[in-house]
Amino acid sequence: MTTELRTRLGAPVVRAPLPVAPSLTPLFAEGGLVRGRTVACTGDAALSAALALSAVATRAGSWLAVVGVPNLGIAAAIEAGVAVERIVLAQPPRASREWITTVAALVEGFDVLIVAPPASLSHHDTRRLQTRILARQSVLIVVDMSALPSLGSPDVFVSDIDVHADTVAWSGIERGGSHITQRTVNVRVEGRRCAAPREETVTLPCSMRQPAS
């Protein structure tokens, strides 16, 4: 079915996947993030992986909304390669109704959303949100920050792709400074929309100070 015919019939138009960094491309059979899907990021490098997945898309013109992620500043997003002029940070109340209303509104204007869901979120709420994500052909990246108070797990969503990212090593401090500049991360991708698990070890930018001894 052609794009024009699909539009006339009211069928969703299939758009090209959102691009990811070359080091991450082998992890995705489609070569990038398929629009309309939900990606769950877990592991100690979950947020770094989420930012890395969305960075190239922002530099290509896509807009990114980061919702409910505590202590994330613009500087950290820039370190990850995100285009600063195409990112919006939002901190809605963590009550499920206010949170879901905020995210649902942002879906209308953003191609990628990185979210840390509140613990109070229900499956009913997430089903409605994912239906909107699919209709709008955005990409929802849910980050596991459940170790923090009042934040929940990605398990409340039905994920299409599961990305597990664990730190293997830090680098930067061996040059004599206290500033960590990079982290080596093992990234494993699997899930119901992934024909077979894929795994890569990649280097991600990082901005951290080594604690004083």
Which functions belong to the PLM regions below?
Residues A55-V56, G81-V82, Q130-R132:
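Short, solvent-exposed amphipathic alpha-helical segments in soluble enzyme
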Residues A65-S122, T126:
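Long, charge-dense
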Residues R59-W63, V84, A135-V139:
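Structural alpha-beta junctions
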Residues L53, V103, L129:
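Aromatic/hydrophobic pocket-lining residues that form π-stacking "cages" and hydrophobic walls in ligand
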Residues A147-S213:
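Phosphate-binding/switch region of NTP-binding enzymes
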Residues M1-V66, G191, Q210-S213:
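Detector for small/aliphatic-rich hydrophobic stretches
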Residues V107, D111-I161:
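A contiguous pocket-lining binding segment that forms or flanks enzyme active sites
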